[in-house]
Design a protein with these regions (language model features):
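Extended alpha-helical targeting/anchoring segments
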Residues: 1-495
Length: 495
């Protein structure tokens, strides 16, 4: 178990931190993240699993799991709700009206301020969950977004996890982490030691939850058939011709009635579509599973990064075909123009909160391959100003230009007009804000969510002046294919 009580006392003497992470290690050869997730879901309805793989399909070092959040913070149309759960499981909810939930998030993060520990994973506790696409209303209050289909999406749903289970795949260890609060240090240390033992016992001996298999009760159908989507593209091209925008992303939701869980869908996605951001999230409101290729915002020790992906081709069936598709992508003027626009937008977004002269494009026009598609990718970074933080980073970048358009504000207005439905999680952000002030979120794409007895997969295409409507409709289908196939395979049953 580390750090020692003496080391914790030394850190606490600095009066800078409210919480110090305490870690206990188990050997991982008896466990898997999927198996442990079954145990956690039995213990708590509110739980998550975050994993990653590189574009070369090399498995990421860490898998993060959490359960039994001590707090859930949600915000919908300015109504902020905080539900606190004590050690005995008793819940208490407070409700208030806010113009922006960010101040409340900052207060909570300050309450648990934690040092970055060199010998621990990058995430040792924090807020995990999502910001919806519609969260933009708080940074852009003049943008009017309506819930025309009455799906009752939350603008934000974040849960505070003080206890974290981490699979370190390099060391082949399971790391159990909880926090020691510095205001009553010795008593808190004893509580933390006891909590780590409870976590170890849960992993060793906890009862498994058998997730109910997903069963579709209707066919997965797009909201907009090809003809209707083509009309939307033509209207968007009219706005481009008139000079309102340069580019806009129009999405097409696919829905079906369904029962059961999305966990097996997640299991298929992690095997067939390994991605930099893979996630399973369960709450009393929604269940979601996905494998996103694209970072929305990553803030680490003051450096803010975003990684726009724009420009798409399907993967080839042979190595030669794949190479030919890559060469075609790199020569496609429409795709290159779209990508350059969105790199510029990423620079502008990061520049809003960065120190002058620090914004730069570190990687440019790299071809990133995934299971079903390849994309053009670039990396934009900046060093944030001293008066800015992770909450400001979300405000500055959400929604990404790759999911909205350029100029962003007008593109969002046109999306609202043409799509005629609240996007909800799609195009938002999924990930964490940790107690050290860092942030790691992906763009909420390549996912399926289940809410109110219905599943939804949503995908979009970037519309520019010379877009061909039928090709843009097909691009939406290509992007949704990995998730649809995962759902179909999960329905057949997994061993």
């Amino acid at each position: 178990m580390y750090p020692t009580l003496e080391n914790i006392k030394q850190l606490a003497q600095k009066k800078e931190y409210r919480r110090i992470p305490l870690c206990r290690e188990l050997y991982a050869d008896r466990y898997t993240p999927v198996e442990v997730m079954r145990t956690l879901r039995k213990a708590s309805r509110h739980c998550y699993l975050l994993e990653s793989a590189s574009q070369t399909e090399v498995w990421g070092r860490y898998s993060f799991l959490g359960y039994e959040p001590s707090m859930e913070i949600t915000c919908t149309d300015g109504t902020l709700k905080i539900r606190r759960t004590d050690a005995q499981g008793k819940a208490e909810e407070t409700v208030k009206q806010v113009t922006h939930p960010g101040d409340t998030l900052r207060e909570i993060i300050r309450e648990y301020k934690t040092p970055v520990m060199e010998n621990m994973p990058p995430f040792t506790g924090g807020l995990v969950g999502y910001f919806s696409y519609d969260y933009i209303k708080y940074s852009e209050p003049k943008l009017k977004l309506e819930d025309k289909e009455q799906q009752d999406f939350r603008d934000m749903d974040l849960m505070l996890f003080d206890q974290v289970i981490v699979f370190d795949h390099f060391k082949q260890k399971v790391l159990l982490i909880t926090g020691v609060m510095t205001d009553d240090l010795e008593a808190s240390y004893e509580v933390a030691v006891k909590k780590l033992e409870e976590m170890a016992q849960l992993i060793r001996n906890g009862e498994h939850m058998e997730f109910e298999p997903l069963k579709l009760e209707s066919e997965i159908r797009p909201k907009f058939p090809k003809e209707k989507y083509a009309d939307m593209v033509e209207k968007a091209k009219h706005y481009i011709k008139e000079g309102d925008i340069f580019q806009v992303v129009l999405s097409n939701p696919m829905r079906a009635k369904a029962t059961g869980s999305l966990f097996d869908t997640y299991r298929v996605l992690r095997a067939t579509n390994p991605s930099p951001y893979m996630f399973y999230f369960s709450s009393d409101d929604i269940e979601l599973a996905g494998a996103s290729p694209e970072t929305l915002a990553k803030l680490e020790n003051g450096t803010l990064s975003t990684f726009p992906l724009a420009g798409t081709r399907p993967r080839g069936k042979t190595r030669e075909e794949d190479k030919a598709l890559e060469e075609g992508l790199l020569k496609d003027e429409k795709e290159l123009a779209e990508h350059n626009m969105l790199v510029d937008l990423g620079r502008n977004d990061i520049g809003k909160i960065s120190k002058i002269g620090t914004v730069k494009v570190e990687k440019y026009l790299c071809v990133e391959r995934f299971s079903h598609v390849m994309h053009l990718g670039s990396t934009v970074t900046g060093i944030i100003r001293d008066d800015k933080d992770a909450v400001d980073a979300v405000d500055a970048i959400l929604p990404a230009g790759t999911l909205s358009g350029a100029p962003k504000f007008r593109a969002c207005q046109i999306i609202e007009e043409l799509e005629q439905s609240k996007r909800g999680i799609y195009g938002g952000a999924i990930g964490y804000l940790d107690f050290a002030g860092n942030l790691d979120t992906c763009i909420a794409i390549r996912l399926v969510y289940k809410k109110n007895g219905e599943i939804c997969i949503r995908s979009g295409a970037g519309i520019v002046a010379d877009s061909v409507p039928e090709k843009e409709f097909q691009e939406c289908c290509n992007k949704a294919r990995a998730v649809v196939q995962a759902i179909e395979q999960a329905q057949e049953g997994l061993e």
